[in-house]
Regions:
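Conserved catalytic network of the ASCE P-loop NTPase/AAA+ motor domain
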Residues: 220, 290-291, 343-344, 392-393, ...
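Conserved Class I SAM-dependent methyltransferase catalytic core
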Residues: 17, 24, 33-46, 328-402
Length: 518
């Protein structure tokens, strides 16, 4: 459903206030540091309000408050069991965000209380199905850091200010056309990415690119059993797929521990139940999770041209063994492609963003590329994107689409969208219309002059499996023919104008006595 202008204004106002609150924490910290605190506090407020709602539902009709019920041992154990079943954790009454706000108002709050409370959330899940989704979730929010203040009093004062300001914000996460809280969290992640420089690519894919990837892997699907991102970052790309169609389960792997925590928070905050997502913290290529599984949709924006070991052991790894070559140590791009293809279901769709080098580099990469096209016929489309649309890098990128269910005579679609963008101050952007043009062209699989081309497998073979887009999409603009007669006439007119101007100048000089008659 489209959002109203009023809701759009509410969003903008909420975003403005959130970023102002985030700046209260800035101090001597860089963006990657104070990001952990502001996102952690927003998330803790969410957990608290979620728990309060569950407690209210569980006690409806009981004529007893949550605090009173918790004081009764029998009620308390029933409430714990109910909360664990419904949301995967529980929070004691005195540890709720709202309870701490009351402590701040009476000047009874201590930052140590918050530190203890977040540890208790994690330990409440021990031995439960939700344990892996919560353990270590707040490990990057170091409330004892001197960056927050030199002593407990200073740290308490700063965190109290942030908590009070957050408490004033209208986070509503039910009965709304738009997920205000989820949207606010995505806004914060995006803003932090914009200030994080080269590190931004580790955890965030711009929303318009995410939209393209998500629309591609959900094309023709009214639901997906599962979607998998092997380099899931903050989880935003996975969640974007859920905005396009119904997704039952989300799977991801992320090497960076801080980003892994962010992804789990993002899932929970978007009301994905703990049993409906599985995010793992490890190196995808070296220690892959989910072996033996395949997925309806596989989607990723992996680190570009990253290094990997390319160890000889991988020659017998079922992800890579059929290709005859391993991706080079200095560029893991094709290792990620091979990994993703291995996890793709026979009827699924895969979309991955990578630098243009994967289209034409030779040696081992050329062998792998040829195998995927000639032997397997998995390549569905190549989409060239504009330069400078990603955080942290200005290089042009492309989207590769793969399917295992292609027919032998299916063509491969090439789209050159490299010149379709809105120029920004520091970064280029894709408009909604430009995104829709890409998606519409992909769905129609049509050839459009100077924009797209549907190539046969034989044409690709004739190009020696080089996928460089200009080989297939001719964007050359012919210059208008030059009318030499008109050019000659223009030159005569210019000479005439020069002569007239010289006469005027000479006349003025004579009046001034500078130039005498000859």
């Amino acid at each position: 459903m489209s959002i109203t202008e009023k809701q759009r204004q509410q969003q903008a106002e909420l975003h403005k206030k959130l970023w102002s609150i985030a700046n209260d924490l800035r101090g001597n910290m860089d963006a990657s540091e104070f990001r952990n605190y502001i996102l952690g506090l927003v998330f803790y407020r969410f957990l608290s309000e979620k728990a309060e709602q569950e407690y209210a539902d569980a006690l409806s009709g009981e004529n007893i408050t949550y605090q009173e019920a918790w004081a009764d041992e029998e009620y308390r154990e029933d409430l714990k069991a109910e909360l664990i079943d419904q949301v995967g954790y529980f929070i004691e009454p005195q540890d709720l965000f709202s309870a701490m706000i009351r402590e701040i108002e009476t000047q009874d709050f201590d930052i140590e209380h918050l530190a203890t409370a977040i540890r208790k959330v994690e330990t409440s899940t021990l031995g439960e199905e939700s344990e892996n989704d919560f353990i270590g979730l707040f490990s990057d929010m170091d409330l004892s850091s001197t960056r927050l203040g030199n002593n407990v009093k200073e740290r308490t004062a700063l965190i109290s200010k942030v908590m009070v300001n957050l408490d004033d914000l209208p986070f509503v996460h039910s009965d709304m056309e738009i997920d205000m809280l989820g949207d606010a969290y995505e806004f914060l992640i995006g803003r932090f990415a914009a200030t994080a420089g080269k590190k931004a690519g580790e955890f965030y894919t711009p929303q318009q690119v995410s939209k393209i990837l998500a629309k591609i892997v959900t094309d023709g699907k009214d639901k997906l059993r599962h979607v998998y991102d092997p380099t899931c970052g903050s989880g935003s790309l996975l969640l974007r797929v859920g905005k396009e169609t119904q997704v039952y389960r989300y799977f991801g792997q992320e090497r960076n521990n801080t980003t892994y925590n962010l992804a789990r928070m993002n899932m929970l905050l978007h009301d994905v139940r703990y049993e409906n997502f599985d995010i793992r913290n490890d190196d995808t290529l070296e220690n892959p999770a989910f072996l033996g599984h395949t997925f309806d949709a596989v989607i990723a924006n992996p680190p570009y041209s990253a290094k990997w070991t390319a160890d000889s052991k991988f020659e017998n790894d079922e992800r890579f063994s059929g290709y005859g070559k391993l991706a080079p140590k200095s560029k893991a791009d094709f290792a990620f492609i091979q990994h993703m293809v291995h996890y793709l279901d026979d009827e699924g769709t895969m979309a991955v963003v990578l630098p243009h080098g994967v289209l034409f580099r030779g040696a081992a990469e050329g062998v792998i590329r040829r195998y995927l096209i000639e032997k397997k016929n998995y390549l569905e489309a190549v989409i060239g994107l504009p330069a400078n649309i990603f955080y942290g890098t200005s290089i042009p990128t492309c989207i590769l689409v793969f399917k295992k269910c292609r027919q032998q005579d299916d063509n491969v679609l090439f789209i050159d969208a490299s010149n379709d963008f809105e120029k920004g101050k520091n970064q280029n952007h894709l408009s909604d219309a430009q995104v829709e043009r890409i998606i519409d062209t992909y769905k129609r699989k049509e050839t459009i002059d100077k924009y797209s081309y549907s190539a046969t497998l034989q044409e690709i073979a004739d190009n020696d499996y080089n996928l460089n887009i200009p080989r297939y999409v001719d964007t050359f603009e012919e210059e208008a023919p030059i009318d030499l007669d008109q050019v000659q006439q223009d030159l005569k007119n210019i000479d005439k104008e020069i002569a007239e101007i010289e006469q005027e100048i000479n006349a003025y000089l004579k009046e001034l006595g500078v130039l005498k008659d000859e």
